[in-house]
UniProtKB/Swiss-Prot annotation:
Stated family: Belongs to the pneumoviridae M2-1 protein family.
Job of this protein: Essential for viral replication in vivo. Plays a role in the association of the matrix protein with the nucleocapsid, which initiates assembly and budding.
Name this polypeptide is given: Protein M2-1
Gene: M2-1
Location in or out of the cell: Virion; Host cytoplasm; Host nucleus
């Protein structure tokens, strides 16, 4: 039995070099050390792919304490505006987590009220419907919503964040908080 070196280019049972590969693909010929290295490599790949899709708030995926301290210092809107303006080195991950929290704060009934005031041909109706769908998705599964937001291209994500902030501000102008109403009455 010939002792060729184990293939370094094999991933999930397929060699990236194709038929011209001169390394061994027979696992029974591989020394135990090479099998352990391959097993560790495969487990790390599985862990990374699972972490990205399921657990968006873990340390591995990047939403650890750093993002939470940014949010604590700047607030949810501050993090999103910093991401839009490309200041304070806000990552896409922290912007998506902050966006999810903002979507949780907005009431979809308020947006439906704004949408119903618009003309049927208004381009704002599509924006309102998009934000409403993100709010509904966020209520069902916030982690999946964060994952969906992270998969958006940067320019589309920035446009979505800007539209959501505009709608949030529009709702706050139309429906002032109870504290503001009490101050106006006095």
């Amino acid at each position: 039995m010939s002792r060729r070196n184990p293939c370094k280019y094999e991933i999930r049972g397929h060699c990236l070099n194709g038929k011209k590969c001169h390394f061994s693909h027979n696992y029974f010929e591989w020394p135990p050390h090479a099998l352990l290295v391959r097993q560790n490599f495969m487990l790390n790949k599985i862990l990374k792919s699972m972490d990205r899709s399921n657990d968006t708030l873990s340390e591995i995926s990047g939403a650890a304490e750093l993002d939470r301290t940014e949010e604590y210092a700047l607030g949810v809107i501050g993090v999103l505006e910093s991401y839009l303006g490309s200041v304070n080195n806000i990552t896409k991950q922290s912007a998506c987590v902050a966006m999810s929290k903002l979507l949780g704060e907005i009431n979809s009934d308020d947006i439906k009220g704004l949408r119903n005031k618009e003309l049927p041909t208004s381009p704002k109706i599509r924006i309102y419907n998009t934000v409403i769908s993100y709010i509904d998705s966020n209520k069902r599964n916030p982690k999946q919503t964060i994952h969906l937001l992270k998969r958006l291209p940067a320019d589309v994500l920035k446009k979505t964040i800007k539209n959501t902030i505009d709608i949030h501000n529009e709702i706050n102008v139309n429906n002032p908080s109870d504290i503001g109403v009490n101050e106006q009455n006095e």
